[in-house]
Amino acid sequence: MFDVDDSCLHEEDFLYVPEFRLYLESYKKANGTGLSRKTINRHMTNVMDFLYYSSTHNYNVDTEGPDEVPIDIAFLKRGNDYFSSYFDGWLLHNYESEDSIRQSVTSVKKFYRFLKETGRIESAVADHILEELKEY
């Protein structure tokens, strides 16, 4: 994980992180087993990286520069261009392997499923985003 400058982070940006950990701890795979602690920690690290990126690269859909506005759930509704800048741009400069990027995509998908299942994001929006994430 990279160094985090806490001065740019806002408490509300990471509001769902503790709940997401609980969600992962209760997650059951198709064979009925849960996720290992190592897998949960990897998902948490990947999602924290994604949220950090989102909080420091909060692009307004009408502009090409970062906003000064703290992020809220609206950043999670961004489209394919936003994911492209994260997965194809930022991650390629910070990870050495495509496997790491695939793992990050899987973690972000789990995070969106969590947001959908807990009613934090509308089902139609989450389904659309999850469909877009299939490209990665």
Predicted regions and their residues:
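Exposed alpha-helical structural elements
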Residues: 15, 19, 82, 86, ...
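Sparse, context-dependent recognition of short Cys/His-centered cofactor- or disulfide-binding micro-motifs
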Residues: 5, 9, 68, 118
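Intrinsic N-terminal pre-sequences and regulatory tails
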Residues: 1-10, 135
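Residues that form generic nucleotide/phosphate-binding pockets
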Residues: 23, 86, 90, 132
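Generic signal for short, ordered secondary-structure residues
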Residues: 3, 26-29, 87, 94
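Short, charged hinge/linker segments at domain and secondary-structure junctions
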Residues: 60-66, 117-136
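Non-catalytic DNA-binding core/recognition domains of DNA-processing enzymes
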Residues: 33-117
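N-terminal "first-domain core" detector
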Residues: 8-52
